[in-house]
UniProtKB/Swiss-Prot annotation:
Record-linked InterPro entries: Cyt_c/ubiquinol_Oxase_su3 (IPR024791), Cyt_c_oxase_su3_dom (IPR033945), Cyt_c_oxidase-like_su3 (IPR000298), Cyt_c_oxidase_su3-like_sf (IPR035973), Cyt_c_oxidase_su3_a-hlx (IPR013833)
Protein name per Swiss-Prot or TrEMBL: Cytochrome c oxidase subunit 3
Organism: Strongylocentrotus purpuratus (Purple sea urchin)
Keyword Nucleus: no
Top EC category: translocase
Keyword Transmembrane: yes
Amino acid sequence: MAIQHPYHLVDQSPWPLDGAFSGLMMTSGNVLWFHTQKTNLTLVGFLLLITNMVNWWRDIIRKANFQGSHTAIVNKGMRYGMILFITSEVCFFFAFFWAFFHSSLAPSVEIGVAWPPSGITPLNPFLVPLLNTGVLLSSGVTLSWSHHSILAGNRTESIQALFLTVALGSYFTALQAWEYIDAPFTIADSVYGSTFFVATGFHGLQVIIGTTFLMVCLFRTAGRHFSTHHHFGFEAAAWYWHFVDVVWFVLYWLIYWWGA
């Protein structure tokens, strides 16, 4: 039967049910992990969830590239969806910054009426944090280079620039892990440690997600999935990565520099 509309009506798929089952397994596994220190169910649920995500997104890519299901109307809807997703991430960080300022602008007697609290040695903002700022800024430049190369039809330069972006994102994660290991305080050290590690850790998670997103785009670029006019998957990854860049600048300014 001919389709008389520009919308994509998805076919029946096992992936939503499989994803729900994997999420249930991970949640149940986390409960067991917290109470019995056994991680088997959590790991199995996590592996099933990763498998589900890979297969589901592979189907989406196939329908976009090889079946032509993603029309201009569908692309417009996905753009709105990505904007709403990034907006939800903004709300997350707004909550983290609210908690940070609530604790730092009027320190309570429990932490010595001082910020940072008594006994806390904050990290030097001009060492690893400043290096990480330079790394993320550079990754934003290389990502823009890759995007402009796609628009110009230069696939080779786009691959090179995207590879550099993925490498810089991985380097940022390694530096962040080293900073956490070497930090003179932990997440259990008063509200300072809690707000610091939750805010920077959540951002670090976004960097890992963004790096994975860009890595997929790298493979897709090498596989000639993107054209000069049809590359929303790349654009969505670029939007997300630039959002991560902006959040880091705010984190560096408020938590590392002002907060110290």
